[in-house]
Amino acid sequence: MTGFQFNTVSDLRVGAGTAQQLGVLCQQLGIAKPLIVTDPGLVQVGLLDPVRDSVAGGCDEVSVFSDVTADPSESVVEAALHALMTASADGVIGLGGGSSMDVAKVIAVLATGQQSLPDLYGVDQVTSERLPLVLIPTTAGTGSEVTPVAVITTGATTKAGISSTRLLPDVAVLDPQLTLGLPSHVSAMTGIDAMVHAIEAFTSKIKKNPISDTLAKRALHLLAGHQRRVLSHPNDMAAREAMLLGATLAGQAFANAPVAAVHALAYPLGGHYHMPHGLSNALMLPAVLRFNAPVCEALYLDLATLLPQPVGPGVEGFVVWFEQLIADAGLPQSLSDAKVPEQIGRAHV
């Protein structure tokens, strides 16, 4: 066996009600004045209030930055950093989907004043220490709570990544109560995103290893086995917890055995057409699976055994299973369905 390295979060708290322990958790981390980073949608649906109340039970003062947008820009990061500095916060709590958690990661590093945002772009460019960091996902998709990566929008159609183990949080809190009632289209897109993470980690040509393989397979089993249930019964706590855990396991897998062609093709769609990341992944997945089939057949057939039956024969049966899931979820099944123009300029490719 070839040697490998595996990094992940050292402290995971999983289960219904775990977010009610945030005050105690902050005390354990030495956080007295945290900043909660989230988005307006979570404020509107009332998810912020119980989290803030829980945090307040163990802290002197709690501040909130709730202006995170999808595909957060550099200006959003700078605004969040300003809020942190104004509040003299000594810790950061990211609450939400990947966008909120990514912003939380970045400002926890920038808060020390040792580096500017452009200094961080790239791989292993973070040299600064960071503030204590807690991440709490409210969707079962990105796995950002356990990945050493943040993605920031740098222009009208461009993004830049930051990859460093210093972005891994001190603690990730997985509370399925915070995902109950998530809109079905969001559950569908984020769930498929997480499944793509698992598939691409398992079939990755780079850094694939026994730990990432084990996590990816367990992740796909959980995600594929509960995706339809959360769409038909959005308040099923057990199904929500399975999806949340599956997304986290997939995140741990692809954080160490990186994603590939599906994501490479999906990123430009998000950048140029502002398409949700989970949807762009769903659109690219079937074509990439078929393209890779000649060299990934054995791996795909292994993964096919983890899917709920019925699954048709061979690799084509594996691909069709995902096509049917995407269709049943009511998501667009082609670029034209998603309003992407047939003629795409060379600059967009």
List where the protein language model places each region.
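Glycine/threonine-rich beta-strand-loop-alpha-helix active-site module
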Residues: S75-P176
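Gly/Pro-rich interdomain helix-loop hinge
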Residues: L269-Q343
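Short glycine/serine/threonine-rich phosphate/pyrophosphate-binding segments
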Residues: A19-L22, Q44-L47, E74-S75, S99-V106, ...
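Glycine-rich phosphate/pyrophosphate-binding beta-alpha loops
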Residues: G141, T248-N281
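Conserved small/polar residues in nucleotide/adenosyl-binding loops
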Residues: A347-V349
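Carboxylate- and glycine-rich phosphate/diphosphate-binding segment that chelates Mg2+/Mn2+
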Residues: V149-A257
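ATP/NTP phosphate-donor binding region
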Residues: M1-G91, E316, L335-S336
